[in-house]
Design a protein with these regions (language model features):
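N-terminal helix-turn-helix DNA-binding core of bacterial DNA-binding proteins
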Residues: 27-79
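A short, conserved structural fragment
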Residues: 88-98
Length: 163
């Protein structure tokens, strides 16, 4: 029996197809993860790992020093800090509210946070096997990622993202 959405999918543009694939992967990860996390929390946890890298920390410090600390900035600071506090409550990160690096706060992964990120990576690899991503598919995806990366990179750089 043919899949009921086969014809609809055949007519979709690339953007819609990419969205379906991304949603499938995230659904698989969230359904099989040993802890309940929202999609945004998974993304935030990954950002903590990324921001621990010395290069990324230097960029954040530099952007924070240049930032206009107006009311809108402080509102965003509070919103992000509240999101990080939810991860801290789950024991995934530690928040330093008085770091000695010039930032208003800094976050570090805990052992549990590292374990959850490893579990997420394992689940993503399982999902790749389930949906049948081949080496040829992976090469096409790498090319698409490289070709599209510059758009988001320039945007983040222009906006001076530091949170």
């Amino acid at each position: 029996m043919a899949h009921p959405h086969k014809n609809a999918i055949a007519e979709m543009d690339a953007s819609s197809l990419i969205s379906i694939i991304a949603e499938s992967k995230m659904t698989y990860v969230r359904e099989n993860l040993s802890i309940f996390l929202h999609e945004s929390q998974i993304k935030l946890l990954r950002n903590v790992k990324k921001h621990e890298k010395p290069h990324h920390k230097k960029v954040r410090i530099r952007e924070y020093e240049k930032a206009d600390k107006d009311d809108l900035f402080n509102m965003h600071l509070g919103l992000y800090l509240n999101k990080y506090k939810k991860l801290e409550k789950n024991g995934l990160i530690e928040i330093d509210l008085n770091p000695d690096n010039g930032l208003p706060y800094d976050c570090l992964l805990t052992g549990k946070g590292i374990e959850i990120l490893e579990e997420i990576a394992r689940l993503e690899n399982e999902w790749e096997g389930i949906v049948g991503i081949s080496e040829d598919d992976r090469e096409v995806l790498k090319k698409l990622a490289l070709d599209s990366f510059e758009i988001s990179y320039k945007h983040k750089k222009n906006k001076g993202f530091i949170f």
